[in-house]
Amino acid sequence: MNTMKTTYIVLELIIAVLSIAGNVLVCWAVAINSTLKNATNYFLVSLAVADIAVGLLAIPFAITISIGFQVDFHSCLFFACFVLVLTQSSIFSLLAVAIDRYLAIKIPLRYNSLVTGKRARGLIAVLWLLSFVIGLTPLMGWNKAMSGCPNSTNETGADHGAGHHGCFISCLFENVVTMSYMVYFNFFGCVLLPLIIMLGIYIKIFMVACKQLHQIELMGNSRTTLQKEVHAAKSLAIIVGLFAFCWLPLHILNCITHFHEEFSKSKPEWVMYVAIILSHANSVINPIIYAYRIRDFRYTFHKIISKILCKTDDFPKCTTDNNQHLTVTNVNAPAASVTI
């Protein structure tokens, strides 16, 4: 094993540990702090669960694949597809949060009755199901079985056809997943399109908020709460932006590989390693953003860590002074409030 691959594996293991620790902290915070139990944060928990799975399962799979060991074709294909499931779940969670924030600021009077915790949990279940369908699509036939298996042999040295489970190959991502799936279906249809939709939603959120701030004569308190809503939208938009920053390089490399086959043969090995590490590092970022930008999470993280380090018996309840509420207020109407 060369130095570059060893460095890659060490960095992946560090990312895995940080991802698991940080996102378990997010789930723990929502579980113990009642002010964090709302539809928006349920979507963030879904995102955290996907990031935990990245650290717990996807990164070990990625390390295994990078080694290129000999394994049954469909087992290798499952390893390769699993990270696609988690990526798709993250995309859907971010899209759900964007739509949730748009509804909160666009129809504040109906928001609380329309967006409930029960509906959010049901939607999360549906989105995870869709993520599995999309991510595991290569297992249904859109893969490199025909080109990957005919010349491969099993442990006894006997040749096997593409459709047989005894087909053993060197388990590398590009040996099992077609670039046509990765580029046209996964990237263009299931990653880039939702990112463009989210960009449009957040632009619309800021336009609506600015219009309300400038055209409606709000009372001091109402103006403050609307500004808090805008601050929250900015925090979530940052998360989307960082997701795009971390994942687009890998997808761009896939596009170049697909449209320029000679690049796939000549590209430096380190380029792909950097792109993969960057994509996995995204799973570490979100808890940091929550702690830095969202007061409720910061407060609860502090209490959890204090409890662990100081061995305190009870978890102190949050006071309203330490909570950041996302509230959209309409003139002459009660506020629709949700805390994240």
UniProtKB/Swiss-Prot annotation:
Lipidated positions per record (S-palmitoyl cysteine): 310
Classification via InterPro entries: Adeno_A2B_rcpt, Adenosn_rcpt, GPCR_Rhodpsn, GPCR_Rhodpsn_7TM
S-S pairs: 76-171
Binding-site residues, adenosine: 174, 254, 279-280
Keywords: Cell membrane, Disulfide bond, G-protein coupled receptor, Glycoprotein, Lipoprotein, Membrane, Palmitate, Receptor, Transducer, Transmembrane, Transmembrane helix
Membrane topology: Multi-pass membrane protein
Extracellular side: 1-6, 66-76, 143-178, 260-267
Cytoplasmic side of membrane: 32-41, 100-119, 204-235, 292-340
Glycosylated residues, chain numbering: 151, 154
Keyword flag Iron: no
Pfam family, one: 7tm_1
GO molecular function: G protein-coupled adenosine receptor activity; G protein-coupled receptor activity
Subcellular location: Cell membrane
Residues that span the membrane, as ranges: 7-31, 42-65, 77-99, 120-142, 179-203, 236-259, 268-291
Domain of life: Eukaryota
CDD domains the UniProt entry points to: 7tmA_Adenosine_R_A2B (cd15069)
Transport in keyword set: no
Cellular component, GO, one term: glutamatergic synapse
GO BP annotation list: adenylate cyclase-activating G protein-coupled receptor signaling pathway; cGMP-mediated signaling; mast cell degranulation; positive regulation of cGMP-mediated signaling; positive regulation of chemokine production; positive regulation of chronic inflammatory response to non-antigenic stimulus; positive regulation of interleukin-6 production; positive regulation of mast cell degranulation
Free-text function comment from the UniProt entry: Receptor for adenosine. The activity of this receptor is mediated by G proteins which activate adenylyl cyclase.
Family according to the record: Belongs to the G-protein coupled receptor 1 family.
Protein name: Adenosine receptor A2b
Organism: Gallus gallus
